């Protein structure tokens, strides 16, 4: 599945030995129940593969590298492996990867230096509108650029260990810092562009991880990004992760939703 290949194959420059194994490489914690009502769990053939963000009753935003041939989603979940009466299951009627995302990169066994993963966004149209409740709510797109130094919250059910790919039952939250893009450009061999955000902790240990892709990055209370890619192992010191800079895509998101309502 291509979303796994992307995460595992990205190469880094100027990076020394990996940090020792940590029980929670993302350095996160159990999110307060129902505190992230826009969080979406994206599935392929009954397997959780990515995160997502509910934008309105009919649309979910996720990462383009999560592309597969069919999807289903769960809304309003807190426990990944348990049934919850308040959660809502929806099929996806159609997916809309950003036309500027280079899908051919997902076919490669290894990712070459200089590869450009810009435009890592995809919209999913739900087959049936979500019911808006206390635990299922959309979140608005940003209206202004985020500032480096902002405190951000990322969330998801991705791996909580760096190499053994251990998923949690509880939705995980982690606080990280928005950094200048130069911090990422120095350590990745792939391109870091202005449609990306760089976020993490330079000391390591706090990070998103495999299968968090497409989930929300909320900075100073505003949705500013979605998880794109990061180092292997996750939480590597000196290596922040890459997120898609959503304000650069407001027009595409709104136009796509309107034309395909």
From Swiss-Prot:
One GO biological process this protein is involved in is: zymogen activation
Going by the UniProt record, its keywords in alphabetical order are: Disulfide bond, Glycoprotein, Hydrolase, Protease, Serine protease, Signal, Zymogen
SUPFAM superfamilies given in the database record: Trypsin-like serine proteases
Enzyme Commission number(s) from the entry: 3.4.21.119
Query: Recorded GO terms, molecular function?
Result: peptidase activity; serine-type endopeptidase activity
What S-S linkages are listed for this chain?
A: 31-173, 50-66, 152-219, 184-198, 209-234
Which Pfam family is one of those matched by this entry? Trypsin
Signal recorded as keyword:
yes
Stretch forming the signal peptide: 1-16
GO annotations of cellular component type: extracellular space
Keyword Hydrolase assigned to the entry: answer is: yes
Domain Peptidase S1 residue range list: 25-258
InterPro entries attached here? Peptidase_S1_PA (IPR009003), Peptidase_S1_PA_chymotrypsin (IPR043504), Peptidase_S1A (IPR001314), Trypsin_dom (IPR001254), TRYPSIN_HIS (IPR018114)
Q: What does this protein do?
A: Cleaves REN2 at a dibasic site to yield mature renin.
- So what family is this one in? Belongs to the peptidase S1 family. Kallikrein subfamily.
Instruction: Supply the name of the protein.
Output: Epidermal growth factor-binding protein type B
Query: What gene name is listed for this protein?
Result: Egfbp2
């Amino acid at each position: 599945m291509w979303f796994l290949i992307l995460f595992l194959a990205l190469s880094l420059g100027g990076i020394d030995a990996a940090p020792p194994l940590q029980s929670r490489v993302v350095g996160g914690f159990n999110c307060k129940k129902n505190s992230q009502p826009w969080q979406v769990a994206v599935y392929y053939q009954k397997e959780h593969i990515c995160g997502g963000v509910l934008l309105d009753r009919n649309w979910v935003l996720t990462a383009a590298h999560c592309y597969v041939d069919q999807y289903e989603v769960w809304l309003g979940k807190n426990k990944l492996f348990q049934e919850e009466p308040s959660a809502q299951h929806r099929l996806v009627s159609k997916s809309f990867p950003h036309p500027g995302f280079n899908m051919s990169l997902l076919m490669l066994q290894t990712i070459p230096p200089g590869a450009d993963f810009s435009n890592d966004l995809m919209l999913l149209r739900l087959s049936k509108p979500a019911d808006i409740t206390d635990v299922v709510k959309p979140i608005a797109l940003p209206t202004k650029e985020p500032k480096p130094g902002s405190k951000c919250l990322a969330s998801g059910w991705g791996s909580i260990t760096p190499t053994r790919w251990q998923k949690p039952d509880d939705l995980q939250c982690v606080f990280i810092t928005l950094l200048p893009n130069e911090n990422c450009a120095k350590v990745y061999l792939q391109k870091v562009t202005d449609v990306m955000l760089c976020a993490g902790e330079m000391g390591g240990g706090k990070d998103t991880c495999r299968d968090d892709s497409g989930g929300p990055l909320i900075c100073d209370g505003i949705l500013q990004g979605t998880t794109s890619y990061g180092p292997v192992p996750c939480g590597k010191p000196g290596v922040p992760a890459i997120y898609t800079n959503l304000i650069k895509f407001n027009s595409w998101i709104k136009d796509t939703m309107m034309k395909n309502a």
